[in-house]
Amino acid sequence: MSVTRRAFLAASGAAVVAHPAVAAEPPSPARRTRFAVSTYSFWQFNPKQLQDVEKCIDLAAEMGFDGVELLLRQMTDESPGYLQRLKQRAFINALDLCGFSTHQGFLSPDKAERQKNVDLTIKQTELAYQLGIPTMRVNTGTWRTSKNFNELMKNRGIEPPVKGYTDEDGFGWVIDCLGQCLKTAEKCGVTLGLENHWGLGRTPEGVLRIVDALKSPWLRVTLDTGNFLEDPYDKLEKLAPQAVLVQAKTYYGGGLWYTLELDYPRIAKMLKAHKYPGYVSLEFEGKEDPRTAVPKSLEMLRKAFDRA
């Protein structure tokens, strides 16, 4: 005879009442926060810095991280052999490959261009699957009405839509395009994490509008602590319940585009209040040598989260 969960719990409760002398089990110890580092931290799109992803994995292990987040644009090869070498390199170093950071752009009135980026995102999802990575960072893309990324940053991430179109058009395109990617995400077991990363993801309301519209467990949020340039804490908290990966920015030596004085003890307490269980992945974006700044960042983050 089967026993329902409700009946089991009721019987268990009765047993406790009947035997008051039985001591309650002590609470389980709090889970330790796991820290990863993005390979971007060592490279930063700078040809003078370390691009070799395998060496970045080795450094992550030497510095005491638990995992590594791979930046696709940093990888020099996408062949199966190369992907499996990266996976083995992480395994040998006892590191998780915990995140895959990719780029795509859906803010274009050109339907063929949008479809090209849908196909790209599907391919990227399949690469994440081959690497055994459970979550992949995705973006809305930008309107590309800025001359370059430096100008976009000078304007605090704000840019006008393409002439003749509005953000409302853009939301429809992004929702449609990401919706087309979800079947592959489910098939591959890769949770897409929409990042608060410029474009229509510049605000928490924009990110949540897209995620809530699709209502899929395979589209959640990648939460970047450094992409809300004003009043970040309330904005970060709005996204925390949906977060599957947290990217923690640091800026030792001064930021490449800007510097934020982030209160990590406050951020850690907020994430703990929302019972965030996942990885905190360091994205170092400062001018100091990564070989000194990355370990310094890890030490700071550990202290903040251990005390939360």
For each feature predicted by the language model, list its residue ranges.
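Active-site acidic/histidine proton-transfer and metal-coordination neighborhood
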Residues: 12-14, 18, 24-29, 89-99, ...
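Metal-dependent catalytic neighborhoods of phosphoester/phosphodiester hydrolases
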Residues: 78-84, 111-114, 291-293
